[in-house]
Structures are given as C-alpha cells and as structure tokens.
Amino acid sequence: MKKEFDFILIGRITIDFNPTDYYNNLENSSLFKKYIGGSAANIAIGLSRLKNKVGFFGSVSDDQFGNFVLNVFENEKIDISHIKKTKDHKLGLTFTEMLSEEKSTILMYRDNVADLQIDVSDIDLDYILRTKILVISGTSLAKSPSREAVLKALFLAKNNGIKVVFDIDYRPYSWKNLDEVSLYYQIVAQNSDLIIGSYEEIQLTSRFCLENPENLIDDDYAKYWLKFVDLIIIKNGKKGSKLYQKDKKLVAKIVPVKMLKGYGGGDAYASLFLDHYLKNESDLENGLALATSAASIMVQSHSSFDLPDYQKILEFKDNALKSDPDLVQKKEWNAFKK
C-alpha cells in the first residue's frame, strides 16, 4: 500500500509567548512575541520543512488561538483533517522566562486544555494506515480522554506494521502523580520501535520495570529497553546524547554556540533525526550529527519551531565536523553480549 504520509503525530499543541525584552524576570517583561508551541507541533513543522508529508491527530480551541494554529499548520503544509475544534476548552499558554543565555524557565497554563480532548472516536484506522511512522508525544498521555486515544492509535499502528516513535516529552503539568506517569510511559515505550528521551525521562519511564533506576547509567537503560525497541536515544543536555541499537552505540557531543535561550533544541533534534532515520537508516552517524547540529541552531533562535532550511543545517553540521571530527563517535557495544 502506497503511503500518503511519512509521519503522523499525536500530542501537544500550545501557544508560546516569548519575551522580546529578554534576560529579565517574567514579572518585569512587558513585550512578548506569539508562536505556535508544543513538542508535537514543533516536530511536525520541522518534519514538514524537511520535505516530509505530515499529518496530525489533535484538538484545538474553537477560537482565535485555535484558528492561529490551523493557519500555521496549513501554511507549513501539514494536513489538518484530523485536528478537531473544541468549544469548551482552551489551548494551553506557555510564557517563557529567559533569564540569561544559560537559564530559562517556563510558566504554563494547562487547566482543561484543548490538546488533551482528543477522543478514541477521533482515532481513525484508515488515517493511521496512510502513514509510514506514528510519532507519539508523552504529554498526550497525561489525562483522559487523550490518554485512551493515544493507546488506541499505538495499538492500531503496532498491529498494522506501522512504526511507532515515542518522544517522551515529560512535563509535570496535568499529571496527578509520578506513578501515573511511569505506568503509561512504560506501556507506550514497551510497544514502540524507537524511544527518544532525556536521561531523567528514561529513568521516569523505567521506575516500575527496573530495580533502583536512579542508580543506573545510560548503558543499563539501553540494555533493558532494547528488548522491546529497535533504537533508543538518551539525551543528557550539555553532555550530548547517545544512540543505541542492539549492536551499535553512538555518542554525540553538542556543538557549542552562543545561546539565546536554554531550551528549544530538543524538538529540532527530533525533527532532523527522524527525517534522516526515515530516509537513510543505514547512516545513523550522520543523522545524529545533523540532530545535534539542529539543536544548537535552535537554542540561538527566539522561537522553538522556526527550523531553518536543510541546507543551512547541513552547512552548520559540516563546519562543526571540521572543528571537531569526533563530534559523533562509534563505541564498541553489544546489548546482549554475556
């Protein structure tokens, strides 16, 4: 069956307000610029800009902000046929506090948010069958009815041979407690093909399936999760990231840059890596170099979605490799060797 879409995503859509009078406390900021936000939305836009066909399962408010999101998606050539409007819920609002190049905080308003109102009846098997990869953002598991909708999409994809990517995307907002987080993250992770998360997110996902997960290192987590998935990426902020498969381990550094803000790189990282994973799975070293380069580019940007064109990212990556040929290193590794 010919696939109409390269990726369909399900997850968080928000409105971001980033201060233009930055390096200031939020209470003293007066001027803000409005952007589309949310990890799933940012990744969808990034993938579309990389010439992928992208669809989306989602829910937005039936108001001006909801219209803004749909207009942005249409302008970015993302299919909106499965994004519904809800009259009784509003899109989440995110205000960013950019205190310095290194330090940023986020103030979120996510009570009864629209993006968590997607329902099991909104999940269409025919739509899922039209994609090569389903990308699930972990925030969409925080509450019902979105939680059940995501699980339906997960199992429909899995049972029909559609690859599933789990972008953990943990945000404490909306969740009742950590046990709930770990329970649903574990269910999705154990039924995925690829996991992307920070060390802390992987630890949270592993609380019920590994003993004393807080004492484990990246390699320990990888050995466990590779029993279920084909590939896992563990990110460690300024320490870089690691990619694991059963017989492959790659270690990527970050590309040092003068940052504008201390967040926003993760969605660009995911966009570039997933694009490369789909198009050239045999060359993951280059995919990881592109991903870490894209992350460094985005922490210099005022928004978290405005990914530059591929040629600029490629040039940035090539220059980074000239400065540091060991930007991505291959390590000796076999997950199941005794």
Curated annotation (Swiss-Prot):
It catalyses: 5-dehydro-2-deoxy-D-gluconate + ATP = 6-phospho-5-dehydro-2-deoxy-D-gluconate + ADP + H(+). The keyword ATP-binding applies. It comes from the Bacteria. One of its GO terms (molecular function) is ATP binding. The keyword Lyase does not apply. Keywords: ATP-binding, Kinase, Nucleotide-binding, Transferase. Pfam families: PfkB. Its EC number is 2.7.1.92. Disulfide bonds: none annotated. Pathway: Polyol metabolism; myo-inositol degradation into acetyl-CoA; acetyl-CoA from myo-inositol: step 5/7. It is an enzyme of class 2 (transferase). InterPro entries: DKG_kinase_firmi (IPR022841), Myo_inos_IolC (IPR030830), Myo_inos_IolC-like_sf (IPR023314), PfkB_Carbo_kinase (IPR050306), PfkB_dom (IPR011611), Ribokinase-like (IPR029056). Belongs to the carbohydrate kinase PfkB family. Catalyzes the phosphorylation of 5-dehydro-2-deoxy-D-gluconate (2-deoxy-5-keto-D-gluconate or DKG) to 6-phospho-5-dehydro-2-deoxy-D-gluconate (DKGP). NCBIfam families: myo_inos_iolC_N. This is 5-dehydro-2-deoxygluconokinase. It comes from Mesomycoplasma hyopneumoniae (strain 7448) (Mycoplasma hyopneumoniae).
